[in-house]
Amino acid sequence: MLINIRPGDAPLSTPIHPTAIIHPNAELHPSVQVAPYAVIGEQVKIGASTIIGPNVVIEGPTEIGVGNRIFAGAVIGTEPQDLKYRGAASQVKIGDHNQIREYVTINRATGENEVTQIGNNNLLMAYAHVAHNCVIEDEVIIANSVALAGHIYIESKARISGVLGVHQFVHIGRLAMVGGMARIERDVPPFTTVEGNPSRVRTLNLIGLKRAGVNEAEISEMKKAFRLIYRSNLTLKQALEQLESWSNNPYVQHLRDFLHQSTTVTGRRGPIPGKE
């Protein structure tokens, strides 16, 4: 159950520092901890066992789930950095058991009732920026100083290395690995490793696949699919048509579907190509 907590009337078991500023209409579970000089605004809901570090700013409407750790200086729920924004009632939703490290910024969405959404068990390292309307699924790691532009979608268990920018509307696939300082302007296919400037698909993310429990037979079939897409003389359309007929591997199916949508769905940016 969520209850309204003010610094002056917090139970002794709930350490809310007296210098923290909490709006009377904010809703915090009794087990939430709030460090010195944090500011929690109106229309903010925070679930059980979440820890708010010093100098954190959380504006609403924002919902934060259970067991999250939000470190010093993070800023969540502020207005989008978007010239189209006209004060729409948008929000941020954050799931459970995330780590949001120092000075991370997460903006609200741009349009009415739209959401910037972060799932469960993610790690956002220091100085990462999550812009308006982004969606981050579960178990994603975003390293230091990664800047996500608006409307980016990141599937579960993707790994994004540090000091890079991702173009608006890009999709990053499941279990993809993006190398540090890459320039990401197009979609990153699932299960692949991408690096460089300009960025290129280099190989399958074999380490990530094995850690995720994908068996050797499935990986072997994925290697064949990868070679067909990126190492043959076929066009991407021809390769995807062949994959439709010979593989029931769910990982190959996901790769095929992702690439098909990347090239056919309006608003998608098309996939990053293979190495030259």
UniProtKB/Swiss-Prot annotation:
One example of a Gene Ontology biological process annotation: lipid A biosynthetic process
Cellular localisation: Cytoplasm
GO terms for MF: acyl-[acyl-carrier-protein]-UDP-N-acetylglucosamine O-acyltransferase activity; structural constituent of carboxysome shell
UniProt-listed CDD domains: LbH_UDP-GlcNAc_AT
Pfam families for the chain: Acetyltransf_11 (PF13720), Hexapep (PF00132)
E.C. code: 2.3.1.129
GO CC terms of this entry: carboxysome; cytoplasm; membrane
Disulfide topology: none
InterPro entries: Acetyltransf_C, Acetyltransf_C_sf, Hexapep, Lipid_A_LpxA, Trimer_LpxA-like_sf
Transmembrane segments: none
Pathway, per record: Glycolipid biosynthesis; lipid IV(A) biosynthesis; lipid IV(A) from (3R)-3-hydroxytetradecanoyl-[acyl-carrier-protein] and UDP-N-acetyl-alpha-D-glucosamine: step 1/6
Domain of life assignment: Bacteria
Catalytic activity: a (3R)-hydroxyacyl-[ACP] + UDP-N-acetyl-alpha-D-glucosamine = a UDP-3-O-[(3R)-3-hydroxyacyl]-N-acetyl-alpha-D-glucosamine + holo-[ACP]
SUPFAM superfamilies found in the cross-reference section: Trimeric LpxA-like enzymes
EC supergroup of this enzyme: transferase
This protein's UniProt keywords: Acyltransferase, Cytoplasm, Lipid A biosynthesis, Lipid biosynthesis, Lipid metabolism, Repeat, Transferase
Family: Belongs to the transferase hexapeptide repeat family. LpxA subfamily.
Subunit structure: Homotrimer.
Function: Involved in the biosynthesis of lipid A, a phosphorylated glycolipid that anchors the lipopolysaccharide to the outer membrane of the cell.
NCBIfam families, sorted: lipid_A_lpxA, PRK05289.1
Protein name: Acyl-[acyl-carrier-protein]--UDP-N-acetylglucosamine O-acyltransferase
Gene name linked to the record: lpxA
